Amino acid sequence: MLNTNDPAFSAYTQTRQAHWDAVAQKRDSWRGWGGTYHRRLREVYRYLVRPNQRVLEICAGFGDLLAALEPARGVGVDFSPEMIRRGRERHPAIEFVQADAHDLSAIEGPFDAIILSDAVNDLWDVQTVLEQARRLCHPQTRLILNLYSHLWQGILSLAQRLNLAAPMLEQNWLTLDDLSNLLNLSGFEVIRAWQEVLLPLPIPLLSTLFNRFLVRFWPFYHFALSNFVVARPQPEAVRDEPSVSVVIPARNEAGNIHAIFESVPQMGCRTELIFVEGHSQDETYATIEREIAAHPAIPSLLLRQTGIGKADAMRLGFAHAGGDILMILDADLTVPPQDLPRFYRALCSRKGEFINGVRLVYPMEREAMRPLNFLGNKFFSLAFSWLLGQPIKDTLCGTKVLWRKDYNSIVSNRAYFGDFDPFGDFDLIFGAAKLNLKIIDLPVRYRERTYGTTNISRWKHGWLLLKMVLLAARRIKFI
């Protein structure tokens, strides 16, 4: 625990407070190369933090970054009286609080996002500050940090001497490994880390090329100016038993319906089955009706799809779901319903916030997946893992599980990507990545069909997958 009466800590704080007061007094008239850098930071943070959230920025300075995020409630904390005074003049809608980052007891939370931008390298005790931030979190809070790379220490020192960058006192120069360790000690779990800004200078075309594209590739990202980290509070298992809605898109699957009723296990306090029948050429709809009548003890709902495609069917099913947890189960039963409790436990233990089934770990039954489909899935798993910044081994496994409240957030953010996905898988995966949800792969044994034929057109869907890669590149990776 930090001893705030430590004379060394007091001297450190007083020196830095005076330093940042002096920086604040001349920042309005000061001109340097920081404009390009801070504009890029605002772009990145606006991607990471949705408008109308509750946002806390620790070491907020003037609050320019915080105001750019358009929060429903924005709180900016800084220990510099001059920074606070000028911040209030610039951004009257922001709540500014003069306080030391090592003691946030005066702040009332919780917050949806907490930001430490270019701050941790200037702190006396990073762990104490992170522990203070942890107190202001709810389970879905995202802590977002960025910090200068040690590699730029010499360049930044030269820029300060040339009056091209704001002067800094002695820094901690934490590495990403240092920061990850401190986050773990303070009650946080890292979701992803990456690099930003290769060229912090306003050079037309080159700035965009370096800062949006080259910085994403090896070896260029090793030379980036800023390291970014997104973390969440370390998870605690759910204590109650959330209810479950299992959404089952079904097209030409009459022969599998009875097995679904017999094999989907009870999960949580209530498990409901929601069938969405989609223009079948066999007796799927009538079969579901009969099975619902034959199983009155199982809460069930049958919907007839008016649109086209699996994505439309999933959205229709989710719109009628009443469970706390939403599950997708393909009616072909290539993923056994008996595996669903594993997904339930993974979500309720909060090991992940989006549980993604993976068919590519265990050996498959002989006819479960054609060789070209298998190779294609391998390629796309590598591509999407790189694009999303989290490991995702299989994008098209039909079984995916998430909290309904997170699905509602994906829906509210859907306009960012548009109506692009005929599968439904990418709408969920991209939406989860955009929300910085913790994505966890859960291996399943993929079975061959026992009834009917696949509804997947290999070449048509392969082309659509390529388009998904391009969309993820444009809207997620190269923002």
What are these regions (language model features)?
Residues 97, 285-320:
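Conserved donor nucleotide-binding strand/loop of the catalytic core
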Residues 127-139:
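A short glycine-rich, Lys/Arg-flanked "PGG" loop and its adjoining helix->strand segment in the class I
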Residues 61-103:
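Class I SAM-dependent methyltransferase SAM/SAH-binding core
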Residues 277-286:
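A conserved acidic beta->alpha catalytic loop
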Residues 3, 211-244, 255, 259-266, ...:
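Hydrophobic helical membrane-anchoring modules
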Residues 152-167, 172, 305-320, 337-418, ...:
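Acceptor/aglycone-binding surface of glycosyltransferases and processive sugar-polymer synthases
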